[in-house]
């Protein structure tokens, strides 16, 4: 029973990859690297993601650097599938990451270089993490964002976290 969620996730990704035709472009970039600052832990995070070839399969990686809660090297790699223009022009991404973490992320290009995102993730410690982010595209390559996340984790890990990020789209 423990492995039912990973099996369902992989099956969903495989079915989506074979069934979804090329959707219209949403204007969102998934090929990017970023540096974020977490106001709660006073630490940084490095992130990178990219679509594989011309597909909707998304690979990602992240790592923490310093901070008073996480320390160095809270690393993660992920594999996901982007469903473009699912509803109201928003993209939805389902993903599975290292250490039995699962996620759903919804992103919407609001126009005028503004983007909104909402996410739900569940990690191996049975912690639910909710998040929201507002981003501004300074140029086609540079994006600035502010996000907030909260979880049901015990202690400092469950406190609300504000993250300020700068990203480079490639």
Please provide the spans of the model-predicted regions.
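Outer-membrane beta-barrel proteins
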Residues: 2-170
């Amino acid at each position: 029973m423990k492995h039912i969620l990973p099996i369902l996730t992989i099956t969903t990704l495989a079915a989506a990859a074979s069934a979804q035709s090329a959707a219209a472009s949403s204007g969102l970039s998934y090929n990017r690297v970023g540096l974020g600052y977490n106001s709660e832990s006073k630490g940084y995070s490095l992130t990178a993601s990219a679509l594989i070839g011309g597909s909707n399969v998304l690979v990602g990686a992240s790592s923490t650097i310093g901070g008073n809660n996480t320390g160095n090297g809270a690393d993660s790699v992920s594999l996901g599938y982007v469903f473009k223009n699912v509803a109201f022009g928003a993209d939805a991404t389902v993903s599975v990451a290292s250490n039995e973490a699962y996620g759903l992320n919804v992103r919407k290009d609001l126009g005028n270089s503004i983007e909104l995102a909402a996410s739900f993730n569940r990690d191996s410690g049975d912690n639910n993490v909710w998040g929201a982010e507002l981003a501004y595209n300074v140029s086609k390559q540079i994006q600035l964002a502010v996000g907030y996340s909260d979880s049901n984790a015990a202690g400092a890990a469950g406190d609300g976290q504000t993250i300020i990020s700068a990203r480079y789209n490639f």
